[in-house]
Swiss-Prot record:
Biological function: Component of the Mediator complex, a coactivator involved in the regulated transcription of nearly all RNA polymerase II-dependent genes. Mediator functions as a bridge to convey information from gene-specific regulatory proteins to the basal RNA polymerase II transcription machinery. Mediator is recruited to promoters by direct interactions with regulatory proteins and serves as a scaffold for the assembly of a functional preinitiation complex with RNA polymerase II and the general transcription factors.
BP-aspect Gene Ontology terms: regulation of transcription by RNA polymerase II
Species: Xenopus laevis
Protein name, UniProt field: Mediator of RNA polymerase II transcription subunit 27-B
One cellular component term from this protein's GO annotations in UniProt: mediator complex
Annotated localization: Nucleus
Length: 311
């Protein structure tokens, strides 16, 4: 009885209600049996009718009595407590519907993200290995007087030296025109025109390439005041893709001790876009994929690939 009070249910009335339901079902069954059997064989028609009506009324009174008793017991049973502890079964409603869970799309996105992370981690590892930043206990024990001091001379190169390097690179590639300007002091900005394919704005800091912006050959690269526009992107998706690949190339071609080699290597890689709309993809052999030509160029072989085919 204590448990019944705790949950708010009268178990004795509940048990009596179950027996009452069984009695009600039996009463209803007798009513239908009476209708099924009909009038029994008697001596006269009137006697048969009186017997049938009497039995049918008795059965209906029995059904009515059982139904009233069931209603009375249902009021005594009570309602279960709303604070009934469900424990872990109360968490079943929080489970997602498997048919509506975007499991495949989430796994595919995670797989692509993992591949890109592995690719960029490999690039970062190669760059760190080129920097030669290894330190050992022997090097830490060397006296500071005997250590060779490396002067950061490459950070402040004379403008004449930078002009000579750019001029030599300009003569190396006849189909490429390089215009050098210094609108903001000593830092140089290059406007590279590659045939009739594209234009590239190269922002330099001394002899180090800071950023690049690739635009179409027919696009305007100047602002309203006549200066090179180093901020706005191209209006075409194909050249936006090439801009992203050029930024990746800047991270690949890193050699702080020889910045002129870096600039020459980058210009050699950039020159491979002279056949941007003519070279097919080396992986699938198609010229267009999703409406775009092969925008990726391999850093070593300079072969053309679609962005999705290079992985």
């Amino acid at each position: 009885m204590v448990d019944a009070l705790n949950v708010g249910v009268n178990l004795e009335a509940f048990s009596q209600a179950i027996h009452c339901i069984q009695a009600l079902r039996s009463s209803v069954t007798r009513v239908f049996d009476c209708l099924k059997d009909g009038m029994k064989n008697k001596e006269s028609q009137e006697a048969r009718e009186r017997t049938f009506v009497s039995e049918f009324q008795d059965n209906l009174h029995s059904v009515n009595g059982d139904l009233n008793e069931l209603e009375r017991l249902s009021n005594l049973v009570g309602k279960p407590s709303e604070n009934l502890p469900l424990h872990n079964s109360g968490l079943l409603s929080l489970d997602p519907v498997h048919d509506k869970t975007p499991l495949y799309s989430q796994l595919l996105q995670a797989y692509k993200w993992s591949n890109k992370l592995q690719f960029h981690a490999g690039l970062a590892s190669g760059l760190l290995n080129q920097q030669s930043l290894k330190r050992s206990a022997i090097q830490m024990g060397v006296s500071t007087k005997r250590r060779p001091k490396v002067q950061p001379t490459t950070l402040a190169l004379p403008p004449q030296y930078i002009d000579d390097v750019i001029s030599r690179i300009d003569r190396m590639f006849p189909e490429m025109t390089i215009q050098l300007s210094r609108p903001n002091g000593s830092s140089a900005i290059l406007l590279v025109i590659l045939g009739k394919v594209l234009k590239v704005i190269v922002v330099m800091r001394s002899l180090f390439i800071d950023r690049t912006i690739v635009k179409g050959y027919t696009e305007n690269v100047y602002t309203e005041d006549g200066k090179l526009d180093i901020w706005s992107k191209s209006n075409y998706q194909v050249f936006q893709k090439v801009t992203d690949h050029a930024t990746t190339a800047l991270l690949h071609y890193q050699l702080p001790q020889m910045p002129d080699v870096v600039v020459r290597s980058f210009m050699t890689w950039l020159r491979s876009y002279i056949k941007l709309f003519q070279a097919p993809c080396q992986r699938c052999g198609k010229f267009l994929q999703d409406g775009l030509p092969p925008t990726w160029r391999d850093f070593r072989t300079l072969e053309s690939f679609h962005d999705s085919c290079r992985q």
